[in-house]
UniProtKB/Swiss-Prot annotation:
It comes from Pyrobaculum aerophilum (strain ATCC 51768 / DSM 7523 / JCM 9630 / CIP 104966 / NBRC 100827 / IM2). The lineage of its organism: Archaea, Thermoproteota, Thermoprotei, Thermoproteales, Thermoproteaceae. Transmembrane segments: none annotated. This is Imidazoleglycerol-phosphate dehydratase. GO terms for cellular component: cytoplasm. SUPFAM superfamilies: Ribosomal protein S5 domain 2-like. The keyword NAD does not apply.
């Protein structure tokens, strides 16, 4: 059953599963590309469909609501978080850029994004929204996410960040004992 978020500004439906086909449709081309990248590298299939109901031309509401919906769908996919490795990390170079991402799917939300990005828009996506996207995703997925990016091309930094985060999620979602000294995750 998909997670649906409907506001006066957007309508977003997300259904995630492990593996399988993936279909992503948003009104922001670069967001669509980054979501396809993130979810494919994470080994996730399903559907993400976002519609902008109130055209504000800044992308903020669409990006934020998509992050909320994807985060909640990921949290639902994890159920009780048992049987997963829990931790994951990846380093991804993309030409002159390099990005390190690390995640903990243990049920505690936190985020750190260190990526100097200019205040530009690529394919309808204002890059100033990237840290907000990561923060919102972390909060709604109940995950800790760290992203450190270096490089000169903002497109490369953001794309490598989505690849690295996807690979880190793939590792964290892989079968494992979900180490915890408390005996529970979350």
């Amino acid at each position: 059953m998909p997670y649906v978020r409907k506001t006066l500004e957007t309508e977003v439906a997300v259904e995630l599963r492990r593996g399988g086909d993936l279909a992503v449709e948003t009104p922001i081309p670069f967001l669509t590309h980054m979501l396809e990248t993130l979810l494919k590298y994470a080994g996730l299939g399903g559907v993400v469909k976002a519609v902008e109901l109130r055209k504000l031309d800044d992308g903020h509401h669409v990006i934020e609501d998509v992050a909320i919906a994807v985060g909640r769908a990921l949290d639902a996919l994890l159920e009780d978080r048992r049987g997963i490795a829990r931790f994951g990390h990846a380093v991804v170079p993309m030409d002159e850029s390099i990005v390190m991402a690390a995640v903990d799917l243990g049920g505690r939300a936190y985020w750190v994004v260190r990526a100097k990005l200019p205040d530009v828009t690529i394919g309808g996506y204002p890059l100033r929204m990237f840290p907000h996207f990561v923060r919102t995703l972390a909060v709604e997925a109940k995950a800790t996410i760290h992203i450190y990016a270096r490089g000169t091309d903002p497109h490369h930094k953001v794309e490598a960040a989505h690849k690295a985060l996807g690979l880190a999620l793939r590792q964290a979602l892989s079968p494992g004992e979900g180490l915890s000294t408390k005996g529970v995750l979350g």
